[in-house]
Amino acid sequence: MHEMSIAMSVVEAVVDKAREEGGGKITGIDLVVGRLAGVEVESLKFCFGAAARGTLAEGAELVIEEPEGRGRCEACGAEFPVTSFYAKCSACGQFRVKIESGRELAVRSFTIE
């Protein structure tokens, strides 16, 4: 389960930044996890609680935005939603689709007291 390592990395990064800023307890963390990122969001939420235990992030509210996958056909230029990396163009039927978004995995912001 790589969600635990992701949760641990998020906690470490946010706690380190909070300390740099001279802040106290972290009360909220906003993440962006694209639907094509290969992350089980519910597992990540569960793992976050364990990873944050005993840190400045313990008890912080975790808010996760899940942007949809978007692709652009390299044959005809059409843009459309995709649910996998092996997408067929909805306009011309070609399989030459470049994934434009949906793979995001980032801390958008966090709140400290």
Swiss-Prot record:
InterPro entries: Hydgase_Ni_incorp_HypA/HybF_CS, HypA/HybF. GO terms for biological process: protein maturation; protein modification process. GO terms for molecular function: nickel cation binding; zinc ion binding. Disulfide bonds: none annotated. The keyword Phosphoprotein does not apply. The keyword Metal-binding applies. Zn(2+) binds at residues 73, 76, 89, 92. Keywords: Metal-binding, Nickel, Zinc. Ni(2+) binds at residue 2. Transmembrane segments: none annotated. Belongs to the HypA/HybF family. Involved in the maturation of [NiFe] hydrogenases. Required for nickel insertion into the metal center of the hydrogenase. NCBIfam families: hypA. This is Hydrogenase maturation factor HypA. It comes from Chlorobaculum tepidum (strain ATCC 49652 / DSM 12025 / NBRC 103806 / TLS).
